[in-house]
Every structure is written in C-alpha cells, then in structure tokens.
C-alpha cells in the first residue's frame, strides 16, 4: 500500500521515550527483521538511557534524525555520534553546522526494509521537518496534541506553520498516528483525524487569518534553556567545552 509515495509496511517497531525536564519525546524506530534502527530527537541528558536501550535490544543504530533546532533542551545527537559514529540528519533549511546529511522535502531514509519520508514543515522554525513511515507522523514542534508550536522566535512564521499543517500534514489519512516532540499533560499520541476535528489552533473550523491573529496576541517567555540550547543545537548539540 502506498501513502503519499511511501510504501506502508506493518512491521516496524517504535518506542517512545520522555524527558521530564523538557517534556520532550524521543523516538526509537527499528526493523525487527535486521535490527537496523534510528533515533528521532534524542535529548543529551538521556544519552545513557538511550544507549542502554539500544544495547539491551541489540539494535544496530544507523542514524539520528532531528525535526528542528530545539530551543528548550540540547540534543543528544553530537554526543551519540561521537560515541557511535552514526550520522546526523537535519532538514535543509535548518542552518545547522556539522550535520552529516541535509534532507530536502520528500527525501527518504532507508532503515532496514522500510523508508522514512522527510516532509518540510516550516513555521515553528524555518528548518522544521516532520517524518512519515508506516502510518505514523513524527511532527516535531509543528503539530502537537491539541496545539501547535510557537512562532515567535527562530524565524518562526504563523502563516507558514498554518500552511505546513493544513496543506501537508492534514493531507495524510485521518487514521495516521501523530507523535509530537512535546506534550505537557501526559498525552502520548493523536491522529490526523482528531487534530482536524478538534485542534483549537488549526482544526477545520479555524482559518489562516484567525490563527495568525491569535498567534500575534500570545505573550510567552522564552524557554528556560534558550540561551544555551540554541547555540549548541546549531552545532548538532555540540557544547562549547566539548
């Protein structure tokens, strides 16, 4: 079965992990037939946890996929690469230094017998991407469970974010599972159908102009670790003294 040009397979394993400090999700995907695996959005402070899980499951880690330059925590990508030698992938508009591979819209990463498709979804930042495979969308900070990422820093743009969600992500089947990079209330996943129906920011009843105006009225403090996280993440998570 083909979904937006990607072969949909049923046997892909996915594990979801949480960092309580940043309320950030990381995802481990692996092919159960040959144990090829990738990490999406690892968190630096969870390096030991992530490497321990990969070792325990006897997985062959072949890549680290980032959805965007995070502003609230430092990615574990640089440290994992330093330890394992696996490559780091970012979207082509992210502006990061030191990534091994830059992904254009529609590019696919082969992991064992399945493909992960890159979808450029700018708006939260200009370099945001989402990833699709096997009926699952990993949406970073573009689409949340009942919300969307903020658009008031890192070259964010509300109109662009609205288009990324409604013209790209909402084109996937309604039963597509959505896994975001954050949740602050304990929810773990949603579906495209649920977000189209109920998302208060970008659901079917909200037009683009209303969303843009609502974003202008929001006044939120920057993330606590913004001043350290962004410079490090512009270098794939490299901390200046390492």
Give the predicted meaning of each segment.
Residues 6-59, 130-139, 146:
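Conserved beta-strand hairpin/beta-sheet module of binuclear metal-dependent hydrolase folds
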Residues 16, 28, 108-136:
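Core dinuclear metal-dependent hydrolase active-site scaffold
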Residues 23, 44-118, 197-198, 203-205:
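Active-site HxH/HxHxD metal-binding segment of metal-dependent hydrolases
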Residues 29, 41, 68, 80, ...:
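Divalent metal-coordination and catalytic microenvironments
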């Amino acid at each position: 079965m083909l979904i937006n040009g990607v072969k949909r397979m049923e046997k892909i394993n996915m594990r979801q992990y949480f960092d309580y400090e940043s309320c950030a999700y990381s995802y481990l995907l692996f092919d159960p037939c040959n144990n090829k695996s990738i990490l999406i959005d690892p968190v630096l402070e969870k390096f030991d946890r992530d490497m321990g899980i990969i070792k325990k499951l006897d997985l062959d880690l072949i890549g680290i996929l980032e959805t965007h330059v995070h502003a609230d925590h430092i990615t574990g990508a640089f440290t994992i690469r330093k330890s394992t030698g696996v490559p780091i992938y970012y979207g082509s508009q992210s502006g990061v230094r030191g990534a091994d591979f830059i992904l254009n819209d529609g590019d696919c990463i082969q992991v064992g017998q399945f493909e992960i498709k890159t979808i450029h979804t700018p708006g939260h930042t200009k370099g945001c991407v989402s990833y699709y495979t096997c009926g699952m969308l990993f949406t970073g900070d573009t689409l949340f469970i009942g919300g969307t990422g903020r658009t008031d820093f890192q070259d964010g743009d509300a109109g662009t974010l609205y288009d990324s969600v409604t013209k790209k992500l909402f084109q996937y089947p309604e039963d597509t599972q959505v896994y975001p990079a954050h949740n602050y209330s304990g929810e773990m996943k949603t579906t495209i159908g649920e977000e189209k129906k109920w998302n208060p920011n970008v659901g079917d009843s909200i037009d683009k102009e209303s969303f843009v105006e609502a974003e202008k009225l929001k006044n939120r403090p920057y993330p606590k670790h913004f001043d350290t996280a962004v410079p490090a993440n512009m270098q794939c998570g490299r901390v200046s003294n390492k």
